[in-house]
């Protein structure tokens, strides 16, 4: 009869070999990928918001209720994806700063485009 150390060693090696085989099969087996996707999708993504912008984007004074029907969503793709949702009142307050920001980014892209060619 093998010693307990040998049995434990064989079990450990078997588990490591199984993990290695499972890691290699995800590329070849679509079923294993589906299982991984199900495991990852169980937790809903948390909605993060920087603390410095908390009052600017979501006013706690209840003023959003009157302008909730005219909400504006802005999305653009510079070197990264950016999305902003503003109510009508918030857009009126910050439209100049937002326009300048977009203009600066698009102007930089236009300057860099001929240099790349």
From Swiss-Prot:
This is Appetite-regulating hormone. It is found in: Secreted. Belongs to the motilin family. One of its GO terms (cellular component) is extracellular space. Residues 52-75, 99-117 form a propeptide. A lipid is attached at residue 26 (O-hexanoyl serine). Highest level in stomach. All forms are found in serum as well. Other tissues compensate for the loss of ghrelin synthesis in the stomach following gastrectomy. GO terms for molecular function: G protein-coupled receptor binding; ghrelin receptor binding; growth hormone-releasing hormone activity; protein tyrosine kinase activator activity. The lineage of its organism: Eukaryota, Metazoa, Chordata, Craniata, Vertebrata. O-octanoylated by GOAT/MBOAT4. O-octanoylation or O-decanoylation is essential for ghrelin activity. The O-decanoylated forms Ghrelin-27-C10 and Ghrelin-28-C10 differ in the length of the carbon backbone of the carboxylic acid bound to Ser-26. A small fraction of ghrelin, ghrelin-28-C10:1, may be modified with a singly unsaturated carboxylic acid. Also O-acetylated and O-butyrylated on Ser-26 to minor levels. Amidation of Leu-98 is essential for obestatin activity. The modification Leucine amide is found at residue 98. Pfam families: Motilin_assoc, Motilin_ghrelin. Residues 29-50 are annotated as: Disordered. A lipid is attached at residue 26 (O-octanoyl serine). Its main location: secreted. Keywords: Amidation, Hormone, Lipoprotein, Secreted, Signal. The keyword Transferase does not apply. A lipid is attached at residue 26 (O-decanoyl serine). Residues 31-43 have a biased composition (Basic and acidic residues). InterPro entries: Motilin_assoc (IPR006737), Motilin_ghrelin (IPR006738), Preproghrelin (IPR005441). Residues 1-23 form the signal peptide. One of its GO terms (biological process) is positive regulation of cortisol secretion.
